[in-house]
């Protein structure tokens, strides 16, 4: 049994009444909703004013019989079930009228979740939003027009019965007077043959107004009222926003320009036009794809094309496919594979020029269907990057961002309102509705296949606009690039669109080809190293917990990945840098998983437990803070606390200490440690000596946890996933020209971010292997950026050092430090050593061994100078004063005055022209510096030095890849490019021709500019071949 809360009686308002005794009312009182079987079941109804009734017109006589009021649709010949159904309806009406009465006669609106109006809450509720705002007028006797939301009222009073069979509903309150009776009237409607209504309905309590849902109600028991919270059935999504409505109206205007192709016959006629009459046009193409997560999955082997659009045009205008239709929209969602295949002659024709936005994605999903796409003419994303490489932070390179930007589309200004791309989120996104009926912040979008089926016309307009916008964007960017001069080696070479045609168009096609090839991954090996990594991670975490638990007992249960728990151990009591007076507490409780199964006797084992952590050290030096003002516990901070502890020492328990099974320590004789330089700031903070060493080793173990977690989550686990690979087990990462310098970036997965070889502790590169019968060639440039810097600056010292060969960084150290030079000249050390037969070691130490500190500084300076680093940055790297770092810089520049002069020239040029150029003539733009502050100017000056060096290195790598791709002999041997990672390329081909192929690759990379080298220095290339990437390094 479910019982509703009592409802307040509504004040009666007299309406016109009918007191006739005939079961059939006069025509002027007929209900517009009377039954169709009128003759056999004449309706009992009465009219009223066209608004609402404050009273439901339902009550109980002194004998307990129901009296029907104004809205009864029954007569004495009606069946019991009809009375039951009508009773329900009257109850809903009574509830609704009570709601309306509260709104009309009360002083405040009704609030969500409250049907009972309490005048004492009028003031308190003044800030609540109104539930009902207006009344709608309609036909008399219409329930719909007696409240704003019937369903809402229903759900506020209806309670589901536990029984399968619906039961009668009864509202009992002797104070309720029917509208067709004056006060004191005893008229009531009798049953047929003088049977009262009471005899056919269950007994109900008259003591209080109750909603009862049950088969029967006991006569002799007082009913206990039960309240149950009922959530109204609000819609899942909010209504469209004004922005969305306006966007939809504008979008719908292009529908008349779209030709819908959804059958084979119309597809054939369209393809005939595309391949004959309009073959010489530029064709902008775009696809819409279902069943793919574009952020996580590769399009190679994933996704399903549900539709595509083609918009064609030339310098004279757009193509006309009949009746002014300028765009084709092709439906291939439900059984449209045959329609798609009809377009194979169009997609596969290399002489039909096709432009795309994000070409690599569209071509992969089309080729998943068995069509080999050819005729690549342009990718508007690449054109936009070539025109302005700095848009990543100023509008971006999305189709929406580009086509709605006046600066981009001003070449086709008149078409901007028609061609500006509108996002799917704007058109189809709706905010979710919370349980209380208010709008949430989360915007959701229905699956694209559902949108195409259920909102077809709008979806056709949305998806067709992609190709329309792409065509206009191509025209605008082409005009801009044709208006921009291409300067190569200080000489005019044509326009930047000529540069695109010569370099970036074939490079874009090559990158897509490399993505399609992919690289084979040994998942069994990855699974093995994952187990090893997890084991070592747990060992390191346990070591830290055991050490910390000596100072704070509950630390053995702590979560080592929790920043707050780590901060609690090391930085309790520290004041927030942003909020003066607010400090991190000295102790704090945390909830952690109850892995030990600790439970109170007689109770269930809880999933979590509470631990208390307190600060275990005081006065730790703090150099870094989070944006919220608390001390940072990042990897860099923890490494500065730990120092440089060798990895093999980390997995030992502690220097001079062992632990027994219960975690207590077994003291061993303390060892003498002469050199404390490897230890970090924690050594002194924990008192030095044995305790300081233990602290540094434990914190180093914590750093190790973070490092292993990064390898597991960033490389080992993702490389085993199906989302980035296809059925053959090859990984297909996305290669993009989307960096400001022109360097490639990679995602899903980011193979550009592989750990450095010396830090690749699990040898992850061993997992990248050649297919059976094949071999990998790995070729890498040596010190490419430094050689580029020597060429651009024409630095005599650097050119001579590269010409002499050997260890460039050792030569730099020799030129910087006089005592190192003296040692070389006196033959106390050697710059480099080439062993002869029978020689095991050099006759005297090598410079890199005897003067390791000086060489490390020289090496860091070599790369830092190329990246535009200043004395301030170097002082942070070396942990020295700015003055000392500046003095070291002067030593470097002493023999390299040409570099200093070139850097000053680049800074001035960038501030004046707001751009700098790479070796091949690509530009890197900067914002106007007229009103820029010192910080922004400093950033531009560093970028003005870095961009030409890194950008030129990217030019060299690109030309080398194109040279390899053009080589006919490599194609004949069956070798193909797979990856480019920074200055390194990876190829795969037959094992039997590996040696010959390696020689050709080295030649191509050494002379990347159409078989020549235009630089003033040689390009050193190191190449090997093996079965795995790691083995070939």
From Swiss-Prot:
Residues of the region (Polymerase) are 696-1030
Q: Keywords, A to Z?
A: Chloroplast, DNA damage, DNA repair, DNA replication, DNA-binding, DNA-directed DNA polymerase, Exonuclease, Hydrolase, Nuclease, Nucleotidyltransferase, Plastid, Transferase, Transit peptide
Compositional bias (Basic and acidic residues) = 115-124
Q: List the disulfide bonds.
A: none
Q: Which reaction does it catalyse?
A: DNA(n) + a 2'-deoxyribonucleoside 5'-triphosphate = DNA(n+1) + diphosphate
- Top-level lineage group: Eukaryota
- What residue range does the UniProt record give for the transit peptide? 1-55
Task: Supply the Pfam families for this chain.
Answer: DNA_pol_A, DNA_pol_A_exo1
Quote the record's activity regulation.
Inhibited by dideoxythymidine-triphosphate (ddTTP), but not by aphidicolin and N-ethylmaleimide.
Q: Which GO terms describe its biological process?
A: DNA-templated DNA replication; double-strand break repair
- Which SUPFAM superfamilies did the record assign? DNA/RNA polymerases, Ribonuclease H-like
Tissue distribution is:
Expressed in shoot apical meristem, root apical meristem, leaf primordia and the marginal meristem.
Biased segments, Polar residues type: 125-142
Name the protein family. Belongs to the DNA polymerase type-A family.
The UniProt function text for this chain reads: In addition to polymerase activity, this DNA polymerase exhibits 5'-3' exonuclease activity. May be required for DNA replication and accumulation in plastids.
Q: Which PANTHER family match?
A: DNA POLYMERASE I, DNA POLYMERASE NU
Q: What is this protein called?
A: DNA polymerase I A, chloroplastic
Source organism of this protein record? Oryza sativa subsp. japonica (Rice)
